[in-house]
Design a protein with these regions (language model features):
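Metal-cofactor-dependent catalytic cores
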Residues: 25, 125-134
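Short, glycine-/small-residue-rich phosphate/pyrophosphate-handling segment
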Residues: 88-90, 101
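Short metal-coordination and nucleic-acid-contact micro-motifs, chiefly zinc-binding Cys/His arrays
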Residues: 83-87, 116-119
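Long, charged N-terminal interaction/targeting segments
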Residues: 1-85
Length: 134
């Protein structure tokens, strides 16, 4: 399942990516978000009731607390966290990350991270480097 979150739900979009879900963060106008959702077959997640009413395949999220937003999405769409997919997407740009050799990140991550971790991943688009705990 793929998502697009409206501009009020940037933190939720980031956490859906952490859980491995392909999630765009839309900062365009409502018509643009709907077009992307339709073209890419994405569920539109929004806090905007009007936007929700304009697009059938949308989910209205109420409240501002992240934990409740995540729980609401997971429960409403019957989603589960799949640990195989968790941490598989860049939290910044949504691109799938790929594993990278430890020697390739030397000098590019904090020394403590380099010394205490053996597994690293990189986003091929924005070049952000990840390790367990980032």
């Amino acid at each position: 399942m793929k998502f697009i979150c409206d501009q009020m739900l940037g933190t939720l979009a980031k956490w859906l990516r952490i859980m491995g879900y392909d999630t765009l963060y839309g900062d365009g106008d409502d018509s643009e978000l709907i077009k992307i959702a339709v073209d890419e077959k994405r569920v539109l997640i929004t806090r905007d009731r009007e936007l929700h009413n304009r697009y059938e395949d949308s989910l209205l999220v109420e409240g501002t607390e992240l934990e409740n937003q995540i729980r609401g999405v997971m429960d409403s769409l019957d989603l589960r966290i799949n640990m195989e997919n968790a941490l598989s997407r860049c939290t910044v740009c949504n691109t799938p990350v790929r594993k990278i050799r430890k020697d390739e990140v030397k000098g590019k991550v904090p020394p403590h991270a380099y010394e205490t971790h053996d597994e690293f991943w990189i986003c091929p688009d924005c070049k952000r480097i990840y390790w367990r705990g980032t």
